[in-house]
């Protein structure tokens, strides 16, 4: 996807809240905005 490993980590090494779609650190267990525990990693491959 990205040309550089550093750029790829910066773009995709985050978790997304399933409730409010906020970006969170990869080590997060709860959302920083709403406190929801349902987090997923950002998709590395395009859909479709």
UniProtKB/Swiss-Prot annotation:
It comes from the Archaea. Keywords: Ribonucleoprotein, Ribosomal protein. GO terms for cellular component: ribonucleoprotein complex; ribosome. SMART domains: Ribosomal_L40e. One of its GO terms (biological process) is translation. InterPro entries: Ribosomal_eL40_arc, Ribosomal_eL40_dom, Ribosomal_eL40_sf, Ribosomal_zn-bd. Belongs to the eukaryotic ribosomal protein eL40 family. This is Large ribosomal subunit protein eL40. The gene is rpl40e. The lineage of its organism: Archaea, Methanobacteriati, Methanobacteriota, Methanomada group, Methanobacteria. GO terms for molecular function: structural constituent of ribosome.
């Amino acid at each position: 996807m990205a040309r550089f490993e550093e750029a790829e980590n910066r773009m995709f090494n985050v978790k997304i809240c399933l409730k409010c779609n906020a970006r969170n650190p990869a080590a997060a267990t709860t959302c920083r905005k709403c406190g929801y525990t349902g987090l997923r990693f950002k998709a590395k491959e395009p859909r479709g």
